[in-house]
């Protein structure tokens, strides 16, 4: 069967069926491949019969049953002698499909152009599809966006583009952190405006969010890179590493201040220089505190990652030692005292800065709350001012109330008279304008209907033209490719090879027939020999029984021998019967095994499962149809 399946698969591929390369037998055919193979064969055998059939199996169950019934009717019209129905294709069995495909392969025309050597395989099909798709896309004309239909319109201009203008945003961080004050958490929960409310222009929201996310990601990446390169080598925790860096920076600042103090002392500047240094340190600390939050990423990186080269620092110290004069012990003590006092001042200033920072945070929250209250009061004041202006105007009119009432009544009468005139004019114009509007609307509706009808006709015609052009190009390319492949192939090679293979199959069949005939003749000879031996045994027993029975009445040992002879004959008969029953049972076992194998090839369980799934799908489709009917 393997050779038969290979020949069938080659014939199906020559008819245009896309059989995968890994499929080597009919047993591996699925429902979709079976339907495609049968439809392709029908199209080659009888184009008018197979033109109305689709080679693609639809997803709906009703459509599948219709296609299965149509295929069965087409096969019966061709003269298929076996049983065929929709179940043959939807719930197939290997023997039935093999017999049907053999019948269709025999019906194929032997000298038809469709029977030429057509290239098969996924790679060739994929290349043809890619080439056809590219040519089809290149052949389409370019259309501006205003001339396209709504489904294909794309913005190809810059009318909707905006400048990338990012602004700072105030966003809440993780509220579970213990280092965040409760006042700030309350502000985030109750008073922090949304992102869209923080910016004056909506187009800046996306740019601001992207910039904020980019800055956070880059800061995190810089910290990760620094921690991997330097932090891990220090064997410290991240908090300790940051505190150590902060201490190093403070020491460096103190060293710079000390050097500045020494230079001031050498230049004999007034004693107020120490106070100036203190003010400078205070300003530096204040700026540093604000820069820790508001500095750019570059300044933060420079502040936390910058480290002076030790060799450069050593050279600077040596040059400073050469330039500065030698100091005596008294100057050294004075400098030490001054440094200690400066250190105390630095500590006190840092303490004050921390206190001021906390006060600043609380004041910021208070300011935000006060600003909200001020806004509410401002709105209330504006409303009251409007009321006061109205009342003030009324009070100004009170001294001359009679004349003012007469004037007001005259204004009201004039306004009423003018309103009546306007209403009359509007009514006179309304009728004419309404008629014109209805007429224009009717004309516009007719024009829209006519335009939609013309557009639909033009679209259908364009689709037909494009489909016909694509089909013509595809057939022309296929013809050229098949012609080139046909010319490159050697003539009569495949037919001679298949003829040789068929002759080999015929010779194998003859050998099998000879072996079967030999087995049958041997079986007949064995049966004949068994019958002869059985008859000989029966005759021998009858003669022996007669001879022994004559002497059994007179002699006791002969009587026992007669009994043993009868028992031996009975046991031999039972043994022969047991052997025959064993052979019958073995033959029945072989028959049952063949039946089991036959049923297994029919894929009964899988077909039953498919039937159950199709039944469920049909029930679901019926339920959907009933629901649609009820809705209608």
Curated annotation (Swiss-Prot):
Give the Pfam families listed for this entry. Answer: CCDC22_CC, CCDC22_N
Give the UniProt family note: Belongs to the CCDC22 family.
Which PANTHER family does this entry report, sorted A to Z? COILED-COIL DOMAIN-CONTAINING PROTEIN 22, JM1 PROTEIN
Q: Where in the cell is it found?
A: Endosome; Cytoplasm, Cytoskeleton, Microtubule organizing center, Centrosome
User: What Gene Ontology cellular component terms go with this record?
Assistant: centrosome; endosome
Query: What is the protein's given name?
Result: Coiled-coil domain-containing protein 22
Q: Which UniProt keywords apply?
A: Cytoplasm, Cytoskeleton, Endosome, Protein transport, Transport, Ubl conjugation pathway
- Its main localization is other
Q: Name one GO biological process term.
A: protein transport
Biological role: May be involved in regulation of NF-kappa-B signaling. May be involved in copper-dependent atp7a trafficking between the trans-Golgi network and vesicles in the cell periphery.
């Amino acid at each position: 069967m393997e050779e038969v399946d290979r020949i069938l698969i080659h014939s199906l591929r020559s008819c245009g069926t896309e059989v995968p390369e890994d499929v080597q037998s009919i047993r591996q055919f699925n429902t979709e491949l079976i339907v495609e193979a049968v439809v392709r064969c029908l199209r080659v055998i009888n184009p008018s019969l197979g033109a109305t059939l689709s080679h693609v199996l639809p997803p709906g169950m009703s459509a599948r049953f219709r296609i299965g019934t149509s295929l069965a009717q087409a096969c019966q019209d061709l003269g298929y002698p076996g049983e065929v129905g929709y179940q043959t294709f939807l719930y197939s069995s290997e023997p039935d499909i093999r017999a049907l495909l053999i019948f269709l392969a025999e019906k194929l025309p032997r000298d038809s152009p469709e029977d030429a050597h057509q290239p098969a395989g996924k790679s060739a099909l994929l290349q043809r599809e890619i080439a056809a798709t590219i040519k089809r896309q290149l052949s389409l004309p370019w259309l501006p966006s205003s001339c396209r239909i709504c489904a294909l319109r794309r913005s190809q201009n810059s009318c909707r583009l905006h400048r990338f203008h990012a602004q700072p945003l105030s966003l809440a961080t993780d509220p579970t952190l213990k280092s965040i004050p409760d006042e700030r958490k309350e502000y985030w929960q109750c008073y922090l405006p949304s992102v869209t409310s923080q910016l004056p222009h909506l187009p800046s929201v996306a740019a601001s969010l992207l910039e904020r996310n980019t800055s956070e990601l880059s800061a995190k990446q810089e910290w990760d890179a620094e921690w991997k390169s330097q932090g891990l080598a220090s064997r410290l925790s991240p908090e300790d590493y940051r505190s150590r860096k902060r201490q190093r920076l403070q020491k460096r600042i103190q060293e710079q201040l000390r050097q500045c103090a020494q230079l001031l002392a050498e230049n004999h500047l007034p004693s107020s220089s120490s106070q100036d240094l203190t003010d400078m340190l205070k300003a530096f600390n204040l700026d540093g505190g604000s820069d820790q939050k508001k500095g750019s990423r570059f300044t933060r990186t420079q502040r936390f990652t910058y480290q002076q080269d030790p060799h450069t620092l050593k050279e600077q110290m040596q040059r400073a030692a050469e330039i500065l004069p030698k100091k005596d012990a008294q100057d050294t003590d004075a400098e030490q005292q001054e440094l200690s006092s400066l250190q105390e001042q630095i500590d006190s200033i840092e303490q004050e800065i921390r206190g001021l920072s906390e006060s600043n945070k609380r004041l910021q929250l208070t300011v935000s709350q006060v600003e909200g209250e001020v806004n509410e009061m401002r709105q209330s004041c504006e409303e009251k001012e409007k009321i006061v202006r109205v009342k003030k105007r009324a009070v100004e009119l009170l001294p001359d109330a009679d004349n003012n009432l007469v004037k007001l009544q005259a204004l009201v009468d004039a306004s009423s008279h003018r309103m009546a005139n306007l209403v009359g004019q509007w009514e006179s114009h309304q009728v004419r304008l309404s008629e014109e509007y209805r007429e224009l609307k009717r004309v516009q509706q007719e024009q829209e209907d006519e335009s939609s009808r013309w557009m639909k006709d033009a679209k259908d015609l364009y689709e037909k033209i494009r489909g016909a052009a694509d089909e013509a190009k595809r057939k022309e390319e296929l013809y050229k490719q098949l012609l080139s492949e046909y010319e490159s192939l050697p003539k009569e090679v495949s037919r001679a090879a298949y003829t040789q293979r068929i002759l080999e199959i015929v010779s194998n069949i003859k050998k099998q027939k000879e072996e079967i005939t030999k087995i049958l003749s041997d079986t007949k000879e064995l049966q004949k020999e068994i019958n002869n031996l059985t008859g000989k045994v029966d005759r021998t027993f009858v003669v022996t029984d007669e001879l022994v029975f004559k002497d059994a009445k007179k002699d006791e040992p002969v009587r026992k021998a007669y009994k043993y002879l009868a028992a031996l004959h009975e046991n031999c008969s039972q043994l022969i019967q047991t052997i025959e029953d064993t052979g019958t049972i073995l033959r029945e076992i072989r028959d049952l095994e063949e039946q089991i194998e036959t049923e297994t090839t029919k894929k009964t369980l899988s077909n039953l499962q498919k039937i159950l799934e199709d039944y469920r799908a049909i029930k679901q489709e019926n339920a959907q149809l009933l629901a649609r009917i009820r809705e209608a």
